[in-house]
Each structure stands twice: as C-alpha cells, then as structure tokens.
Amino acid sequence: RTFGVSAQIGDSFSKLSASFKKRKYYSQARQYSYRFFFGALTNKTNTNNFNFGISRVNDYSFNYNLLGRSETTGIFSQQYVKGDAGFKSFIPVVQANQWVLASNLSTTIWRGLEMYGDLGFVKNKEKDASFIYDAGIGLNLVQDYLQLYFPVYSNLGWEVNDNKYSSKIRFTLSLKGNDIISLFTRSWF
C-alpha cells in the first residue's frame, strides 16, 4: 500500500497531485491491484511541458527510466510507466492541462496473465470534462520489471480490430540499478 502527495511550484505553473495504490495477494500467484490518481494544474504559459499525461508521462524532470523519452513512433514510444493517469491505451485525450482523476485496476486471470481496466475524467482549458476508459490483457513476464499490455477496448472502440494493432501494444521495462538488484534479492515464492 502506497500513498503519495506531490506539489510543484514554478514561475509559470503550479501542480498538485495525489496517488494511492494497493496490491493484494488473495491466493498463491493471484492478485488484484488498484491505483487512484488526482492531479490539478495551473499553467500560465502556452506550453504543454507541465501537463499531466494520460497514456504517457510528461517527464520534464527526468524522474522516469524512459528508453525513448521524446519518441512518438516506434517501439520506444510504446514504453509504459505507471505515472500520472496511468492509462495503457493511447487515448485520444493525451494530456490534462487543468485536472485529471483516474483509477487503474487489474486482477490475475491465470499465473502471469491479468486483465486490466483504467477509468478517468480529464479536464482541459476551454473544454468540457471528458470520460476516458480502456481495458485489456496484461502479461507479467517478471512482475514490475517486464510486462506487456494488449489493449482490447477503449474510447477508440475495439482496438484489436486496428490494422496497426502492434503499435498499440505497450511494455514495461525497468532498468534502474536498484530495481535490478531487488529483482534478484526478492522472495519469489
């Protein structure tokens, strides 16, 4: 169980966010997890550098281990980091410049196979709040270190019918030194 609050204040913006996440093992190799996130932003500039990300974090402070930080196409653009709204599908609303409220849910189906769903509301300046959602199948090859996400349905409709479906598949890959060390020192069973 983790709870966090963050406040950032700059010359041209102020940002406040809070998140709560929990993972519960209810039998051997079976779990469910949920995460709630809220973020609010005041931005006095026309730049989107400080906006909250919906499907991809806006890592202006270089806190995340992104392989393709500024990639918009290709395999590195598909890296997933559970931050900000934490959606696994590339939702049409890509950022929030006023506020965002999101939840990320997942449960084990069988061994490393899970199903997930993300729900949220996004408010951007001069627009009405939007309801956003996605659902899909996840494959935990190594929990928290190497995971694949296969979107099934979202605001875009049935994603599996898309001709470019392979570009929608997301992955998590953690290469931080401390993460790799804890991978080999943690209890596996």
Which ranges hold each PLM region?
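C-terminal outer-membrane beta-barrel translocator/porin domains of Gram-negative envelope proteins
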Residues: 1-110, 123-125, 189
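Structural motif
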Residues: 7-9, 119, 151
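Residues that define the transmembrane beta-barrel architecture of outer-membrane proteins
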Residues: 12-16, 95-101, 129-135, 140-142, ...
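C-terminal accessory/binding modules appended to enzymatic or scaffolding proteins
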Residues: 111-121
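Conserved active-site loop/cleft motifs that coordinate metal ions or position small ligands
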Residues: 114-116, 145-152
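Hydrophobic alpha-helical membrane segments
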Residues: 117-119, 127, 135
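Short Gly/Pro-enriched loop/turn and capping motifs at secondary-structure junctions
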Residues: 120-124, 153-157
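Outer-membrane beta-barrel "beta-signal"
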Residues: 137-146, 165-189
